[in-house]
């Protein structure tokens, strides 16, 4: 039976009783003695006794007509009353907002502690993307908002880094930004104990960093374009226009041509930014001599002879359409944009690669991205790395693992506003969930997100099913207060009228009040936070106490002996790498024969 038909029958079944009762009334009227209606009414009692003498329904046409008519009349009355019924929501007249309870969050928590994302002291979110009940499925993207000193690192970043349990059912890699360079010192040893590979990119002190070469991760012409887009997006001057002008588009063509040439034609050891810089330095255009050819022009001319349809050649020919004077200006712009690479340490950092970004989703790894929280000069390197990382992992999930990485990758992006702009991040964050990748975006204010991503900021925040508010005021507090909604409260007023006679009055009424007003949020206790999980009532809870975590004893916070020695780690790593290279080195063996004189001397 169809559900709609079944529902219709169930709703109308009670009316069969009314058909029976009204049919009996019709039978009583028919059996009552009398020639007319008034006479029958006088003897109706006898008719009722006769009608109900047998419990069986009457099948007389008159009785059936009365029964059906009576039931229809009752149905019409019920319909009319329902149509005009007043809608009351007692206790919710002005709003139904309330704080969530343990019962509300229970369906979203994994019974096994290590299988969860830690949000507050009492609220957690399971790492599984496919729970038994599909309606409780939530993405693992978290938006964390908290002003300076609110404990973003202590109450969110560290607790979640401590979830590196070897016994977890959901193995996880971490990519974490480290604005002060302290996280790697405090947690590095813990990760080594848990069997993690440790990777470090340090843009504050390049001598304490592993090497990162973006060219290693270029596998197609699309990757060339992505690298150029990221480079341009994160090396804008303070006053540069948002919309690309002619000069920026021309630079884009030039970079694409050069990087395409390097990727296709250069030997592996020369595939880096140093080669790109040398090619830019060797480029020259003369206004008074249109036939002049620089060494780079000659390189592309030879490449065109070999392959006229070469990707790099096509880009370079478009660049050459501009006049000599224009090209000179473009070359100056390119030199200015890549000025940071004139620093020897930066070039050395990016000449080789030790990151192995494409394997982070294959085995448990922690990658620390150390950046300055006061200077953004080299943050474009971090933006390039993260852009490449996300694209690499998505491609690897699709091409090798059927759409899902074997190791979940969590991007814990502290001071997200200082990282730089990741191209198409609003689109990436909406699609990474299915590849076993999640992002925790940590900000001091949501306005920081809007300043970088403009209209896309709202899309990014909407793709975070969890919002954790640690502290804030002003616009942040107002937005959170509005999102929490209103509750209905009871209020009473007393009045007193004084005159020849004194009278008193008492008036009760319902009012709507914000669950937590803007001023209440501004003065919120420093140990409390607000959690909003999509589809669940908000929670007003204690921030997570890291001293209660089983792995706290492995942090440098608990014991200074646990401090991670970066210099020692890097020197050991490079010594092992040199040994591997030495073992793999090949040598040519020559047999040298002795002359007759030398043989006689022997």
Walk through the language-model features, giving the residues of each.
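A residue-identity detector for tryptophan
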Residues: 99, 247, 263, 492, ...
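Conserved ATP-driven motor cores of ASCE-family P-loop NTPases powering translocation/secretion/packaging/pilus
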Residues: 429-530
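Short, charged N-terminal helix-start/capping segments
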Residues: 4, 60-117, 293-318, 338-370, ...
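N-terminal short leaders/motifs
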Residues: 113-130, 307-325, 472-473, 481, ...
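Conserved long hydrophobic alpha-helices within structured protein cores
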Residues: 113, 119, 380-388, 480-483
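Short alpha-helical interface patches
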Residues: 49-54, 65-116, 221-231, 279-282, ...
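P-loop NTPase motor domains
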Residues: 24, 127, 132-437, 452, ...
């Amino acid at each position: 039976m169809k559900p709609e038909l079944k529902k219709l029958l169930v709703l109308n079944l009670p009316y069969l009783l009314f058909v029976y009762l009204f049919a009996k009334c019709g039978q009583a009227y028919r059996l009552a003695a009398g020639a007319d209606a008034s006479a029958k009414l006088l003897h109706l009692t006898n008719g009722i006794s006769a009608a109900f003498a047998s419990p069986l329904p009457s099948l007389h046409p008159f009785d059936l007509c009365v029964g059906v008519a009576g039931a229809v009349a009752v149905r019409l009355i019920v319909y009319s009353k329902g149509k005009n019924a007043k809608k009351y929501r007692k206790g919710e007249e002005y709003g139904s907002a309330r704080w969530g309870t343990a019962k509300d969050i229970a369906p979203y928590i994994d019974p096994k502690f290590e299988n969860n994302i830690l949000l507050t002291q009492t609220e957690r979110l399971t790492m599984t993307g496919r729970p038994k009940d599909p309606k409780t499925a939530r993405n693992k993207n978290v938006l964390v908002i908290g002003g300076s000193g609110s404990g973003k690192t202590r109450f969110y970043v560290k607790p979640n880094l401590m979830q590196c349990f070897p016994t977890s059912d959901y193995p996880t890699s971490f990519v974490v930004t480290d604005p002060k360079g302290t996280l790697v010192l405090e947690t590095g040893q813990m990760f080594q104990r848990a069997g993690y590979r440790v990777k470090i990119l340090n843009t504050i002190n390049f001598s304490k960093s592993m090497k990162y070469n973006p060219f290693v991760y270029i596998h197609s012409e699309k990757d060339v374009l992505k690298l150029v887009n990221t480079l341009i997006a994160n090396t804008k001057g303070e006053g540069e226009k948002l919309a690309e002008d002619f000069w920026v588009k021309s630079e884009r063509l030039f970079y694409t041509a050069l990087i395409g040439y390097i990727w296709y034609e250069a030997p592996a050891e020369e595939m880096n930014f140093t080669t790109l810089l040398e090619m830019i330095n060797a480029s020259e255009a003369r206004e008074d001599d249109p036939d002049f050819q620089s060494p780079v022009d000659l390189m592309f001319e030879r490449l065109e002879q070999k392959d006229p349809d070469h990707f790099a050649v096509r880009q370079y020919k478009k660049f050459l359409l501009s006049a000599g004077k224009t090209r000179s200006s473009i070359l100056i712009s390119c030199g200015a944009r890549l000025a940071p690479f004139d620093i020897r340490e930066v070039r050395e950092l990016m000449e080789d690669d030790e990151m192995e970004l494409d394997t982070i989703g294959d085995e448990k790894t922690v990658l620390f991205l150390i950046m300055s929280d006061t200077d953004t000069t080299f943050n474009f390197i971090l933006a390039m790395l993260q852009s490449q990382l996300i694209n690499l992992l998505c491609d690897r999930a699709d091409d090798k693992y059927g759409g899902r990485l074997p190791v979940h990758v969590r991007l814990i992006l502290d001071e997200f506003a200082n990282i730089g702009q990741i191209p198409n991040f609003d689109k990436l964050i909406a699609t990474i969930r299915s590849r076993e990748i999640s992002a925790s975006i940590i900000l001091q204010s949501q306005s920081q997100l809007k300043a970088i991503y403009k209209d896309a900021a709202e899309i990014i925040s909407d793709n975070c099913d969890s919002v954790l508010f640690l502290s804030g005021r002003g616009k942040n507090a107002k937005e959170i207060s509005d999102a929490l909604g209103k509750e209905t409260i009871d209020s009473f007023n007393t009045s007193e009228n004084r005159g020849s006679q004194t009278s008193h009055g008492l008036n009760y009424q319902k009012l709507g009040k914000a669950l937590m007003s803007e001023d209440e949020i501004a003065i919120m206790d420093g140990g409390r936070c607000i959690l909003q999980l999509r589809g669940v009532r908000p929670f007003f809870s204690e921030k997570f106490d890291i001293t209660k975590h089983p792995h706290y004893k492995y942090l440098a916070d608990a014991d200074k002996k646990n401090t991670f020695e970066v210099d020692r780690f890097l020197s050991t790593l490079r010594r092992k790498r040199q040994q591997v290279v030495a073992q793999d080195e090949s040598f040519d063996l020559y047999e040298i024969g002795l002359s007759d004189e030398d043989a006689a001397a022997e």
